[in-house]
């Protein structure tokens, strides 16, 4: 039986933007919410979660990533605003939104999806909504207080950055959190 690895495809976020998001995390932490925070170095823009795949498929996936990257130019984005999925009544994920060339980002993700279908990865069922996960909410939370925090930090904004690379990551789940390793990194354009 072939060895499997847990994988996803994402855009790496520059350290300057990560630093701003870390400041935002710290400000929200000060409000005392019970949130399992994503370590700053693990914040990324997921394009496609692949899950557990056979190691033997990595080369084919890398080719699909390369093909996708060739078809798209770098994208200008910024982190902007915050919110929760699926909604304020039952929040599970606390995220930072994006602004900028969002149409180009959706086209990039759609192309990636199409290039992976031939490798038996199903198309995403939900429409793509680019975001940066900051934390996961596991327990009940005071939704009024959370709503107030979302309003208080709604004007959060980073500087503009260029999303210029697509990366295939391996994700290892450990007791202290996920550890991400770059397997393939390809420039857009």
Indicate residue ranges for each PLM-predicted region.
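Histidine-dependent nucleotide/RNA phosphoesterase domain, centered on the 2H-phosphoesterase fold
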Residues: 1-189
């Amino acid at each position: 039986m072939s060895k499997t690895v847990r994988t996803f495809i994402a855009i790496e976020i520059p350290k300057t933007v990560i630093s701003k998001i870390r400041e935002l995390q710290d400000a929200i932490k000060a409000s005392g919410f019970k949130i399992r925070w994503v370590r700053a170095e693990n914040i990324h823009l997921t394009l496609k979660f692949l899950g557990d795949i056979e190691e033997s498929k990595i080369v084919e996936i890398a080719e699909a990533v390369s093909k996708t990257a060739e078809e798209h130019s770098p994208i200008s984005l910024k982190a902007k605003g915050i919110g929760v999925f699926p909604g304020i009544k039952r929040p599970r994920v606390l995220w930072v939104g994006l602004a900028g060339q969002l149409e180009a980002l959706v086209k990039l993700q759609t192309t990636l999806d199409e290039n992976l279908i031939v490798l038996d990865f199903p198309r995403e069922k939900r429409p793509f909504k680019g975001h940066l996960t900051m934390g996961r909410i596991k327990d009940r939370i005071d939704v009024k207080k959370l709503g107030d925090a979302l309003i208080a930090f709604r004007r959060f904004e980073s500087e503009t950055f260029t999303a210029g690379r697509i990366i295939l990551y391996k994700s290892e789940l450990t007791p202290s959190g996920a550890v991400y390793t770059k397997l393939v990194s390809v420039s857009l354009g």
